[in-house]
Amino acid sequence: ALAIFMHCAQKPASLNSANTYVQKSIEYISSNYSYPITVEDIAAYVGLSRSHLFRSFETVLGVSPKKYLTDFRIKQACYLLEHSLLSITAIANSIGFDNSLYFSKTFHKQKGMSPKEYRESHPFNAARAE
């Protein structure tokens, strides 16, 4: 019984620790997504190995840090496509993609349409941009 209690008592601490690392990672991503950061950069920032960071993200969020970073960037791209007149290349560069073709492929994979098609289906409205 004591062994079961000790095992259960340790779980929240490890989850809490993972949650702390994930929170620090999310803050780093939010501040640096516009740069071509990698999972290795995030892991180094929070002081974890790449594999430990992956486990922490999977435990806390159910996704990999790479997927979280990509999803975050695509959400930013959607906002810019809806609320600005920036070119697709400028948007790609502003969210950390140094290759607009790779950005377009990634966007299409996530959204089921190209950035251009997404923009056309969400016409720019100057009032929304304010």
Task: Please identify what each model-predicted range represents.
Residues 1-30, 52-54:
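An amphipathic alpha-helical interaction segment
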Residues 27, 31, 36, 40, ...:
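Terminal helix-turn-helix DNA-binding modules in bacterial transcription factors
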Residues 45, 94-95, 110:
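Residues within the alpha-helical elements of helix-turn-helix
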